[in-house]
């Protein structure tokens, strides 16, 4: 292993949504820094955002808009060096006790050991759908693009355009799918050394603080979004758009490559965790 490693009715959608075709501008326009007491900052006229973590606090931000389906890109440069115990989270989530959520979490490690990408999908407040991966590059050396493509057919997680995971809409087989709760984008840098690195065996070395993750090139040009409950600004849901995208044959090959060579945990093969039987979708995918 590498070292661094049910289609909804268009009429229904149209009743909710209208057309957006412009790329997002600066981080000032798209996000609010929500916590961290000055540890998250925007630079370069809104083109760069950084989150920092020290022993006192981490930091985070969230999108101004909500999304109901979308193709959302963010370039992230992760915490370099000894990042053990740190988590850089980048995810979409709705509100309430029965929330939906689509997660990227980047689990730090000691110097020279690989980051872990932790992914999960929550529906109606229920998760337990973790898949974890190493990467085929050093994610701290430069910015790389992390994408969530979420439409009525599937949720696709991509890294630099390469799919690493697909969660399909299997509602017809009794599997819940996030399709009705708008979500905001959230990101944060925080400490979780009780579980994040090697199951909590390696703790955060605070002599390396402050830790910092950087963000560029946020893009939500292909999305269904709203700025308030009464003001939907939305997407082109025609048959040729991202709204009905699934993996093509080349992407399926890429997915198989990643899952063969870089996947380190798959809930769908964890029989000890699910002694009464694997979740339904595991037998369908």
From Swiss-Prot:
Superkingdom as given in the UniProt entry: Eukaryota
Species per Swiss-Prot/TrEMBL record: Arabidopsis thaliana (Mouse-ear cress)
Protein name (record): Probable xyloglucan endotransglucosylase/hydrolase protein 12
UniProt catalytic activity: breaks a beta-(1->4) bond in the backbone of a xyloglucan and transfers the xyloglucanyl segment on to O-4 of the non-reducing terminal glucose residue of an acceptor, which can be a xyloglucan or an oligosaccharide of xyloglucan
Tissue: Root specific.
Enzyme class: transferase
InterPro entries per record: Beta-glucanase/XTH, ConA-like_dom_sf, GH16, GH16_AS, XET_C, XTH
Site feature Important for catalytic activity, where: 103
Signal peptide: 1-25
Key words, A-Z: Apoplast, Cell wall, Cell wall biogenesis/degradation, Disulfide bond, Glycoprotein, Glycosidase, Hydrolase, Secreted, Signal, Transferase
Gene for this chain: XTH12
Active site: 101, 105
